[in-house]
């Protein structure tokens, strides 16, 4: 567990964790010292004659030159001040624990999200989006809870060890008896409850995965659900997983309460036994053992919550262990490390002996060859599923060929230059996603807007008249997924987005297939007009959209067939 946790934490986090562990030892010493001070206070307060029998106390009384009762009063005031200091120190320590454990949510969530954004495109397409959401939100939060439990476990162990040492010094026989009795009871508790907690943790993880899957799938198919009136079926699925998730948490919370209830009951019985034992042993005079009884009462009063927290924290480690495994595996994913090498595009884009197939599947293409001259307009057509979009992903440098090469001006596309190459490409997909922000932000993807460039692409995409009539202009919110806009308006924003970075290559992946024929023809004419100096690669179903292309290739059985 520690190996995985240290892999996840940064160097600064590990250093702070070490500091917290050292600090917890200091806090434990303060806790133990605070309890140990009670014994001399009660002893002296119950019998002033100690000040006449103990040479150190005689020296103290002579040095202070005040009545004994005043010394006791000042001792009591000092004890109160020390206990206030102890309370403040504990509050500060628990603040540090919370700041570290819950603060890791931000740091680890950022690392996991960053990792998913930086894996290669092919691996990302094989991921389940609901799994990604679950990891970044639920599992990271669970891990932060697990870190909190780990730190609490360690700090309470230090407290127990030091208090145990103190009790051994006072009366080792009673302490050893108490130890055997409590360890035996704790072992029984852990043995009985651990399998239940582990099982509940696995059920929680499975239910949470299904929970996110149902949410993700059905919110993305809301129109279909409404059309087919499938609300009851969806709610039934949701209810089943929601109940399973709740039941797992109920089991965990219920079992977590058992150690406290059990140990409190046992602790009280043990305490009564100790008092009775000491009284019977000293029938004639119990004043001499009053301080011993007091120290054991206070020690047990402090040990019971510690023992409960240790068992509860251990159960939390078991319950959330699957979250640690999931985050660990996510962070071990290999990142796509792209270099900063520059490429120029003055002559041609060449596909040479290209072969590709998704991992574990047959090759879609074998030995494809194609030359695309700079400024040329080409189109790919073919049946659905023949690999047109995959081919475009390869041309855009998102997928890596299994065999063969993609060359730009005779220079092979690779990890060193892929970043610069991708920046040369403007992409307009079939399914356009606009996030719930301003038109300007949806076009530029940044807060640092180049107003001149923005104005230029708005004109090129024929959005100027539409935006001028909006009360807030380019700052108008488009709604989630562009719900406040028509299909044509969303398409034009997508065109403006593709043109904003001034690409040399423009890729249209069935970009206008959702529009009616008239709107499609109008938008395609506009795209051709503003892309005279650009290389265009178009995937199309309707042949009417590619009449102005220089070449048209049909993709069939993994091979090209030139049709124009």
Give residue spans per PLM region.
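Cytosolic ends of transmembrane helices, especially the final helix of ABC transmembrane type-1 domains
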Residues: 211, 223-230, 254-257, 261, ...
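Transmembrane helices of ABC transporter permease
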Residues: 20-26, 152-202, 273-288
